[in-house]
Amino acid sequence: VGSEMCIRDRCIGTIGTKLVNGQVNDSGLAVLGFFSDVKIRCGIITEASRCPVAGTTQLLKQIAEISPGTDDTVCVEYCTGSEEKLVTTFTSCLETKGIHLAGGTVFGVPDGKPPVVAYNGELYEDACVYALIKNTTGKIRVYKENIYEKTSAQSHFATKVDVSRKALIELDGRPAADVYSAELGIPRDKIVDNVLVNPMGRAVGNQVFISSMNGMDTDGTLTNYKRINKNDCIYFLSLGDYKATEQQTRQQIQQDASHISLVLSIDCIYRYLLYEKEGYFSTYAKDMASLGPHLGIVGGGEQYNNQHVNQTMVCVVFE
């Protein structure tokens, strides 16, 4: 099907649970097509884990072709991994042109199969596919939603890490798990299971970007889906009033845009699991669709401008 669709038109694709105009679906195919009022260039970065910078020549050429204006262009991407390398690569090309980045990591691959993305009807491992989209009749805005808040003003510093494993070994010179357990009162053997309630956050200026724990070593090292660098400022977070946060996000979007023609969103699998557990996800999907035509995907990680994040919703709103 993918090959037949792509005979005439460039297209990109990913795998995952889909949200389409208020409906949630784990199977089948959702297709979004642009027919007018946009300029689009699609591309692929192969060998993403080894040398993503090799794709910048083509990316810069395509940026020049669409001539981005002020707040009217976005780069939407889907990747199989190597997120930090890819975000750095995209930022080097997009930031000076005022182009926002919104993307997601593949999630939902069958057991034993490698993650893949699709480009022009072909499947690729270790890759990132993207679409540069310029709105010729209105603005494009990108939003990041965080439903977690700092548990306290207490911050910690990553004093020992292994970036190759996305492992946080020590905070403030102590095993990371010991610091987490002492501050939150969570037994060490319950830390990873507690990720939906109390993830960690990396502070960058006034913003906090979530890093989700996915494992713990016997020495108290915490492995994560988002890389933590040495000397990063880390906070422990707690789940806030997510329904109120969702409402505030929708109100802000409606306030910013006079007319919404499309909403594209990327949600984290952990948000999906939390909302499913709370019996809220179907309501959430309908609420997103109340903004206008909506297509969402649930991924294993999210990319927002110059950051790779976890447990976050990123959405692109077209006027």
Model-derived segments and spans:
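Hydrophobic alpha/beta core scaffold segments
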Residues: S3, R8-E319
